[in-house]
């Protein structure tokens, strides 16, 4: 079976023996702690999310929170932000025990959180989103829109944010929405600011801007909790960090006292010797050929070939048109001109259904908005792409076989969940991503398009997904992989296609590809 062959290929790279770093302590004086968590536990049906953890944040510091997906980071932050109620333990603010009765209570007590999944109202303006429920009123009790604009403009000037306060949020890019979320959190003048993967959709320039804001807040004495999977960010912005693993507190250290390998060992409980396990496999015949592909006003004249067993990386800055090309290939946004050939034969792809009939699969970059059915369980999410194909005979769904294959896929991908009937919204981001990958692998694709396959995923899960992608290529699947992470592009690709402002600026062979050359092509 397809999944069994892939599983054997992945298993051939066995994990090395576990090692650990002794947990440390920041040694923060009690009077210096703006926020402290003691012995907090939280369980969900079939899952212990937090097991008696501790955590401290000092004034005027950036405290990074590290751990694999499912380690308990987001659960702890939701408890601190008043979204969840802990089953046990206590929370102290400025040394005083408190009970948080919801997110508004947490805000009133000086705790603001920027969620990884943005929570803005799309049909309201930027200013209205920032000051919602706090709008200035005129003498008639109506919203004072002039004062609303003035407050927003003053806030943006302080944070050096160049966004029109009158713009509807729905018209903004994901990166701009992220900056609005950050400004909204800052507007509460909270003592504690929690940032959950704040750079996931930002360009390098925008990340630099965000770090300037964070340093400014740190100088004002704010305590900042910074959740990230990116090691370079930890060393650049964090004063200290804590690691969680499988719902347990592992330790706290000063960022200057450890190496990248130390942190990885703390996070995963083992060594990860090969982050980019690219197999050398025979490259087969051309499966997908694209010539002069265009979507008016978005990108133009994109041409390339993709062969069986090949991983073609796609690099470029945010806004370069990478994701738009993927959407055109899969029929999400039909191309306005150009030619697509599969196995040398011209094909017309104007809908995802047509793309799937030609053996294509597409993992989108935004798993929340266009990937997951959040209110449905794992089984429903995993089977969504195959119900009309392999498992329907004589107009009846072969439920037993489908469930067996979904269970096998879940085991192969090491999805951490109580079972197939758990709602996918209760899973960590990394496990949600694995479910979506499993959805498309069940279709047995010949051409697999991956758009940011490891965004927001911890280092251990990244290595697993890299092994999976390499194993798929080894079985002859043609892979088109879009990524904003340069090490991932360079480490996994046989060739790298580079885009800039809607144009393809070059294709570089693996042996000739390096960061300088790719960035040069990406900025032409």
From Swiss-Prot:
User: Does the keyword DNA damage belong to this entry?
Assistant: no
What is the native source organism of this protein? Burkholderia cenocepacia (strain HI2424)
EC main class here is translocase
Keywords, in A-Z order: ATP-binding, Cell inner membrane, Cell membrane, Membrane, Nucleotide-binding, Repeat, Sugar transport, Translocase, Transport
Where the record annotates domain ABC transporter, the positions are 35-271, 281-520
Which amino acid positions bind ATP, per UniProt? 67-74
Where is this protein primarily located? membrane
Q: Which GO terms describe its molecular function?
A: ABC-type D-ribose transporter activity; ATP binding; ATP hydrolysis activity
PROSITE patterns in the record, alphabetically?
Answer: ABC_TRANSPORTER_1, ABC_TRANSPORTER_2, MGLA, RBSA
Q: What is this protein called?
A: Putative ribose/galactose/methyl galactoside import ATP-binding protein 1
Localized where? Cell inner membrane
Q: How does it sit in the membrane?
A: Peripheral membrane protein
Question: What reaction gets catalysed by this protein?
Answer: D-ribose(out) + ATP + H2O = D-ribose(in) + ADP + phosphate + H(+); D-galactose(out) + ATP + H2O = D-galactose(in) + ADP + phosphate + H(+)
Give the UniProt family note.
Answer: Belongs to the ABC transporter superfamily. Carbohydrate importer 2 (CUT2) (TC 3.A.1.2) family.
Provide one Gene Ontology cellular component.
plasma membrane
Annotated function: Part of an ABC transporter complex involved in carbohydrate import. Could be involved in ribose, galactose and/or methyl galactoside import. Responsible for energy coupling to the transport system.
Q: Which domain of life is it from?
A: Bacteria
Which InterPro entries does this chain map to? AAA+_ATPase (IPR003593), ABC_carbohydrate_import_ATPase (IPR050107), ABC_transporter-like_ATP-bd (IPR003439), ABC_transporter-like_CS (IPR017871), P-loop_NTPase (IPR027417)
Gene3D superfamilies per the UniProt record, alphabetical = P-loop containing nucleotide triphosphate hydrolases
Q: Which residues form a coiled coil?
A: none
